[in-house]
Amino acid sequence: MKFRYVVYKLTFPNGKIYIGKDIGGAGHSINYFGSWDNTLVEQDFTKEQLSDFTIRKEILFESENKQEVNQKESELIIRHQSNDEAIGYNQTHRPHKKTL
């Protein structure tokens, strides 16, 4: 059975997470792992660590409605705090830094 449109969570070996969505084509593709910034991820690991690298993928939400998936992705990024650079790799919904 194939998933429709989904929001997923990737967990990297260092425990940091990325929340993403797959709303393409006919639905979720098992080999789709999002559009996270690989330079941000790579800087957290040594070359040796990157040579044996496992990412866990969990489906958090599924819907037939792309707009609902878009909304849920934003909600889950905030809920899981994956937009906090200490916790995750999401670049959207980042808190604004206060300037003095």
Residue spans for each PLM region:
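Structure-specific nucleic-acid interaction/processing domains
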Residues: 1-100
